């Protein structure tokens, strides 16, 4: 029971920011009905069953290639779903897709690698390039490893100082940019995630025939 409670705390820390980022990127482009379904599918990716054995959903444990494949798969599900009556399947797949795309910037060191390339005055978060090819393909790109039980305890304020002392620097506890309390890099991760969410939408706009795209946006 304590394990489930702790994991629930882990999952609840993130939805607020997934919701904000998704609305900021997509609100002008979807009906409210569609947007609510996309957001619901997005935040349900952090449900308890997805916390075990699904590193690809969150880009955890260096599952970079698996996370990329998951995004490609969900994109395929969107296209397949829109060939059938109804839009729900496409909205669910898109919500899942953008959750993983957003987690890429919060759970990998992409932001740190991008900032390391900058010289002079640091750029603003709004200037971050979310898909810089040499960084996406960099051998130095990695994501935080989950070390049980310390990584769970790191999400509990009372245990966080002790957990971080015991966790290695490559742990999720040290590397994640899930919330503002993770420092200034959170703003860069958030900005990159919003840009990536819009990119994924615009990619589908290019891929889908106009009538299918109109169904997808429900506008």
Short names for language-model regions:
Residues 103:
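Short Cys/His-based metal-binding microdomains
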Residues 1-95, 100, 110-219:
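N-terminal, motif-rich segments that launch catalysis or mediate targeting to/interaction with membranes
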């Amino acid at each position: 029971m304590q394990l489930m409670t702790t994991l629930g705390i882990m999952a609840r820390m993130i939805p607020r920011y997934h919701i904000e980022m998704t609305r900021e990127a997509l609100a002008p482009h979807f009906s409210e009905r569609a947007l609510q379904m996309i957001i619901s599918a997005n935040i349900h990716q952090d449900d308890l069953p997805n916390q075990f054995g699904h590193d690809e959903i969150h880009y955890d444990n260096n599952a970079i290639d698996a996370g990329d494949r998951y995004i490609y798969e969900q994109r395929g599900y969107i296209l397949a779903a829109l060939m059938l009556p109804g839009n729900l399947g496409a909205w669910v797949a898109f919500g899942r897709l953008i959750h993983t795309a957003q987690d890429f910037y919060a759970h990998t060191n992409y932001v740190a690698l991008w900032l390391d390339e900058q010289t002079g005055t640091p750029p603003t978060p709004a200037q971050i390039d979310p898909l810089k090819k040499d960084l996406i393909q960099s051998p130095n790109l990695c994501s935080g490893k989950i070390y049980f039980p310390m990584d769970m305890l790191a999400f509990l304020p009372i245990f966080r100082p002790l957990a971080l002392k015991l966790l290695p620097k490559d742990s999720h506890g040290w590397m994640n940019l899930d919330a503002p309390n993770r420092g200034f890099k959170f703003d860069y991760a958030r900005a990159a995630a919003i840009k990536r969410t819009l990119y994924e939408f615009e990619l589908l706009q290019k891929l889908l025939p106009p009538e299918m795209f109109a169904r997808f946006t429900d506008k």
